[in-house]
Design a protein with these regions (language model features):
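Extracellular, repeat-based ectodomains that mediate carbohydrate processing or recognition
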Residues: 23-441
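Bacterial N-terminal signal peptides that target proteins for export
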Residues: 1-10
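C-terminal motif of bacterial Sec signal peptides marking the signal peptidase cleavage site
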Residues: 17-19
Length: 441
């Protein structure tokens, strides 16, 4: 394969409840790296509307925001029938429509504002890896992106939607960012150090059997496009989330994604820009996992940059054999030129897809959350920390406690307040679970 450079021109209920092929196994734990003591579970959103796919982020003023999607209300007409059952007016009907909701907490998640719907028109807001994301301007305004299916309802031919707070308690009318319709999926949005915004997504405007492309655009603080859509990479796995990090006041931009070659081998790569995201150099392999799988696993990498400039990446792979399957970690100490041999953080207990999320504390402690199967073959959420020395791992903590399945965890951290949220499913129903902890004491 490869590689060339590209150039631009609510009601919130509270319930207690790179060395190729090289691998090193992280130690089981250390007395000097203690576990995180989380508080009781809270439920975000309206449980009867099946909330799912949360995303957490702090605004500059210290408020914690959560965004998620949930079912749109549809009422059966008086005396109507569905699936052979008589429905009375006022009963909810199944609906493919989903809305994005945003809420905030000013007291570390103890209490929350009423959720606000972000999308101005009812549409099928996508979830899972493709769920809504939020970033914040220097004035604390929220900027949100999400994905909706194309005109024919095809999730693989979708559109990137954007809205921002309007300063009046609501959101601007949603607009589509991809200039070629029915071509964008899996968007992320990040505030740049200069006060603007990067939006990145996986694009299929050049259709065919080849892998997808990586596209970017820039927005200003008013939501106005500063650039057209532009391609910065190719060969992407079409259904895995992206990651982004900045350095040098935004002059250096790092992006991570999962690549796929002609033999359907799927490895993760780092892309680096030294001109503020205008152009990106050739991809660097993070690890040669050699995972060959015919379809996209819907499980992308996470990236973080510490105070020393080191890049930390986590990901999931099934590898070349079942014995290699699990969540992995690696670090680059030379600005992304190379990566250390991968560390196995948690071995896969069954041939299932796992999901991960990473963030760094002010003291360069790494917090890593992921999903894996327990002894009953139920998906559960786990957490582990890596101290700033890069050697001291905590033990693996089981964070969720559900009779169903828990997955797709996300993290947020401000000073010593760590927060985690995930989607819990039981049959056809889902809900969003939230927990908090004080760390670093």
């Amino acid at each position: 394969m490869r590689r060339k450079s590209f150039q631009t021109a609510f009601v919130i209920s509270l319930f207690t409840l790179s060395a190729c092929g090289s691998t090193t196994v992280a130690p089981a734990g250390s007395a000097s790296s203690s576990n995180v003591d989380f508080g009781s579970e809270r439920i975000l959103g309206q449980s009867e509307k099946n909330p799912s796919t949360p995303f957490l982020r702090f605004a500059p003023d210290g408020r914690l925001f959560a965004i998620w999607s949930e079912d749109h209300d549809v009422l059966w007409p008086e005396g109507s029938h569905a699936a052979g059952h008589h429905r009375m007016s006022g009963d909810r009907a199944p609906s493919p429509m989903r809305n994005a909701f945003l809420a905030w907490s000013a007291d570390a998640g103890k209490t929350w504002s009423s959720p606000r719907r972000v999308n101005s028109i009812v549409e099928a807001v996508q979830g899972e890896e493709n769920g809504p994301k939020v970033a914040f301007g220097k004035d604390n305004k929220a900027y949100v992106v999400w994905s909706t299916p194309g005109e024919k309802g095809d999730k693989t031919r979708a559109n990137i939607r954007f809205a921002m707070e309007d300063g009046k308690g609501g959101f601007t009318p949603a607009k589509t960012l991809n200039e070629v319709r029915d071509a964008g999926r899996f968007p992320i949005i990040e505030a740049t150090p200069d006060g603007n915004f990067f939006v990145a997504w996986i694009d299929r405007r050049i259709d065919g059997p080849k892998p997808r492309q990586l596209y970017l655009m820039r927005l200003d603080s008013n939501g106005k496009a500063l650039t057209k859509n532009y391609q910065v990479g190719e060969g992407l796995c079409e259904c895995c989330k992206l990651g982004i990090a900045f350095a040098d006041s935004g002059k250096t931009v790092y992006m991570v994604d999962r690549e796929v070659d002609g033999q359907k081998i799927r490895n993760h790569v780092l892309r680096k820009s030294t001109d503020g995201g205008a152009t990106f150099g050739m991809p660097v392999d993070i690890s040669n996992d050699g995972w060959q799988v015919p379809s996209c696993p819907h499980s992308g990498p996470s990236i973080g940059r510490d105070s020393r400039g080191q890049l930390h990446v986590t990901w999931f792979t099934l590898g070349r054999s079942e014995n290699e399957a699990g969540i992995y970690y690696s670090v680059s100490k030379d600005g992304g030129k190379s990566f250390a041999p991968r560390h196995l953080v948690h071995a896969n207990t069954a041939p299932e897809i796992l999901y991960n999320n990473l963030l760094l504390g002010d003291d360069d402690t790494i917090y890593l959350a992921w999903s894996n199967l327990d002894g009953d073959k139920k998906s559960q959420v786990y957490l582990r920390t890596l101290a700033a020395d890069g050697r001291t791992w905590s033990s693996i903590q089981h964070i969720s406690a559900t009779r169903g399945n828990a997955g797709r965890p996300v993290l947020a951290l401000l000073k010593n307040q760590l927060h985690i949220a995930w989607t819990e499913t039981d049959g056809e129903t889902s809900r969003v679970i939230f927990r908090s902890a004080t760390v670093g004491q």
